[in-house]
Amino acid sequence: DVGAGKGPVRREVVRIVTPGTLTEEALLNDRQDNLLLAVHRLDTDWGLAALDLSAGRFCVQQVTTSEALLGEIQRLQPAEIIVNEAVVLPTELAADTRLHNQPAWLFETDSARRQLHEQFGTRDLAGFGCAALPAAIGAAGGLLQYVANTQRTALPHIRSLSVENRSDSLVLDAATRRNLELEQATSGNLRHTLVGVLDRTATAMGGRLLRRWIHRPLRDQAVLEQRLQCTGALIDRDCHTGINASLRGCADIERILSRIALKSARPRDLSGLRDSLALLPDLDAQLSSIADPLINRLSAELDRHAGTHALLQCAIRETPPVLLRDGGVIAAGYAADLDEL
């Protein structure tokens, strides 16, 4: 407390900013994931763990060859890579400027497993499908410890992790990705890429998801047919236009919620969340009118969060300032004590 006594004010490092742990809107590309990647090797297996701190997405996988490791790094395009300093890396990876060596103990399997149990509040990892992937567990635990060390705060929005298997998708090597010009064209123009042609998404969240799908084409025919049927239902009933129009008013809720969880949200994050929640009743009504299994399941799971919206509606001014220190964030009438100031 600055006013508690005389003498110098105690200063502490409250956060260490690194390329892979950015969450600020102004520092991120809203249509690209900002990934922190951890790499660990155990015997002949390579473990990878990728975290998008700005969105709360956490996934792991385990591969058996250096070629597969490099291919996954090429696909993920992480902003930062941390590696076990005791591991001998492939030459191409060792020269990567995004690389940061970390102590070997950070990736030790038992401590990493405990780190994950503590983060998720579980006794084991069987429910996540990674219990038999020790190299991936080491990478995931090391990554969480690194983030805890740099952010100096809890990570309540990291509630789960998913396991990715290369057998679930088409495997594209670096040369194939370049030749197909998925997201980078030889001309340097995004419009000349597959993403540039296909991306008509209404939200930043949708844009990021589309890029993940393009870079990891599924092989599961049942899932693909389900998505195709869903798209057909939207077009046949001419519902996609109205849904698209509603979604265009939606803020980047995924990243806003992460900033709220990390206690770094700004006033306009809260107003953006409020305005986005206001769209849910209309979206729910539109989705409920469509006879499609995938859309019906989505509609059934949609929570309008009426209580949260009501709180933000009465607590936050219509157009709050960018920074909290500028004042004028809390709406008149919400807190009598503030109204008197």
Place the predicted regions along the sequence by residue.
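Charged catalytic and DNA/RNA-contacting regions of genome-maintenance
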Residues: 1-233, 241, 245-261, 265-341
